[in-house]
Each structure stands twice: as C-alpha cells, then as structure tokens.
Amino acid sequence: MEILFKNLHSRGDYYILPMDVLITNDDGIESSNLMALAKAACEYANVKVVAPQHEQSGVGHGFSYYRSLHYAPAESFPCEAFWVDGTPADCMKFALTHIYKDFHFDLVISGVNNGDNAGTASFYSGTVAAAREAALWGVPAIAVSLQKQSDYALSYVLKWVQDTLKRRSFAGMPKQTLWNFNVPACSPEKPCKGVRISKTSTAMFNDYYVEAEKSKDYLGEETTYLLNADSKRKSAQNDNNLQLKAYNLMGNKITDFAYETDDWWLAQGYASLSPQTVDLTDREEFKRLMDYESV
C-alpha cells in the first residue's frame, strides 16, 4: 500500500514511501510508550500494532501451546491495532501467521520497553523475544528499550526510530537477525552521548529470593495459592489445604562489564546497538567436536 508521508527532515515536501511496519511490546497494549512509538512510526510508515493484552515483562520467548488465544481490536491508536491475550512471542507468531498472514512487513519494532534489555537480560526479555520471533520468520526486527523511563530518553529513542525508518538502515539486515537497541538513563542535564555498535554482554545477575508478605499473580494482583492432598496447586480458600509461602525475585546485574559490550557502553552514557542472530551454534565448539569425532 503506497501512502504519502511528510518528510520531517526536509522543507515540507512529500514523497511516496511504501513501507509496512508491525509494532509490538511486552508492557501491554495500554502502554503509553507503545502509543508513542506507533505515532512516531506512523510519520514514516504504514503501521500495524499487535501487542499483549496485559503486562508480559520477563516472560522471555514463552508461547501458548495448549492454551487458546483470543484477540480483539484496540482503540485510540493512529493505525489498525489489536491486543492478544498471550505473550509477546504469541503476538508476533499470531500476527504473522494469522491476522496478517497474507501481508508482507518490511520491519518489526518491539518496545519501547521501560527498563533496558542489554546483555543477558535479552534472554529473559519479552520485548527482545518478540523481535526474535519476527526474525525467525524472516522479518527484520528491532527491540528498543530505555534503561530508565523519562520524557527525554523516550524522545531520544523515538527520534532514532524515525531516523532508522527514514534512512532504511535496517534494509541490509541479514536474514534471521535482529537489533537490540538500548538507551542509557539520560536527561537534558546528562544527555545521551551517542550510539555505539556493541557486542552482547554476558554479565550475570546476583539473583536471590525474599519471602513476600502477600502473594501476587502475573498481573500483579494479590492471590492465594494452596497445596491440597494430591499436591496440585489451587487458588481458592480451603481449610484442609496448606497455604504456600510467596517469594519474590530480587537482585541486580553484576557490573563487571566486558569492554565495549552493550552493558559497558550504557554505563559510559552511550546508547548500544547490538546485532543478534537466531543461529545458536557455537562455531568453535562445533569445530572442536568435529575434530574430536574424526580422530
């Protein structure tokens, strides 16, 4: 579909730009960052939105196998939009194989996430997983995240997205590849220093769990989990059942970052752009095993 778009970086002229972009996130369809991203992208592309009905942070690449999915139109967006009652990976898989199965997208953008997804966080991130799912289907994809939410940081990433769309710098992305873009905590007093191409950090977290006073479900709502005689979990009061204790995950990323990795650049005040691939093969170990096998 060819649409006329205003070139914001020129003197008001118009040009034909047939570009189709699919947007999603893991913070849910009601995220203000999702709306801002859709509005920014609409300046340069024909945009569709398919996002989770509810918050899905930290679900990684999980998807619904036994559970049925449902979807419905979402209102107030400047483009066609739907919510899906599933994970970010569900949204992407469902969008590409069902809602828009006969549609070709030039790019998928996932975000803008509140919280960075640099380094090992990208393994747990629903934001990155949605982009990875798109890459699995051969669609170029970008995950965009903020280390710390602020109007300044959001404005920075939206401008970067618009520049990327205008320049079509994603067009040369290899098949089954995605970009992981993270913006550091920044402000007018401490602006982002620029963008650096980076490797993905392997810095781990010092995770631990603390007992919680109240149990919460994946929506953050209070709930009670009970263990009955046959050891099946229940969520209803029963005097014959034992109430289970609740534990919440705590911890921070260990800050011994390797030089010029995404975590390292963020710590220096730069935005990081890390290319990732769905090919998980360890080349060195593959060669070692082949050599070992041939002996």
Residue spans of the language-model regions?
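Hydrophobic/aromatic ligand-binding patch that stacks against planar heteroaromatic rings
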Residues: A130-A134
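Short, glycine-/small-residue-rich phosphate/pyrophosphate-handling segment
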Residues: I142-F170
